[in-house]
Design a protein with these regions (language model features):
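Short recognition patches in nucleic-acid-associated and regulatory proteins
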Residues: 1-21, 32-61
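Short Cys/His-rich metal-coordination motifs, predominantly Zn2+-binding knuckles/fingers
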Residues: 24-27
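Short, intrinsically disordered terminal segments enriched in charged and Pro/Gly residues
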Residues: 39-113
Length: 113
């Protein structure tokens, strides 16, 4: 199933990481979406996660101010920091949705490579 939201703006996109600003089609709540692919070098089974975190007004303003346009890879840690603040909705590699607690989402791992 798909979630009722629209991507309003790309903040960073690559083949293994992506961040987008989104908006709920029903209520207009802004969300920060984060995609991360963990590469399975040994078995080729890449694990892909997508996570969404609702944004409050000051966070949306801060992101809009700090990211007036899409930026490069150096922006990943700056955008990742938002996901440690509150629970996030996660779509895991098993195509299952669940809410995670702050700090335990696999997407919070540091950038490597």
């Amino acid at each position: 199933s798909t979630l009722p939201y629209e991507i309003t703006r790309s903040l960073y996109e690559s083949s293994h990481y992506a961040f987008w600003l989104c908006e709920c089609r029903y209520c207009g709540t802004p969300w920060l979406e984060y995609f991360k692919e963990f590469i399975g070098w040994l078995d080729g089974d890449d694990k892909m996660y997508t996570s969404w975190m609702p944004l409050v007004e000051f966070e949306l303003a801060e992101i809009s101010r700090n990211f007036p346009q899409e930026r490069g890879r150096e922006s990943i840690p700056e955008l990742q920091k938002y996901f440690g603040r509150r629970r996030t909705l996660v779509l895991d590699p098993k195509n299952s949705y669940h809410w995670d607690q702050p700090g335990i989402n696999p997407l919070h791992l540091a950038v490597t490579g």
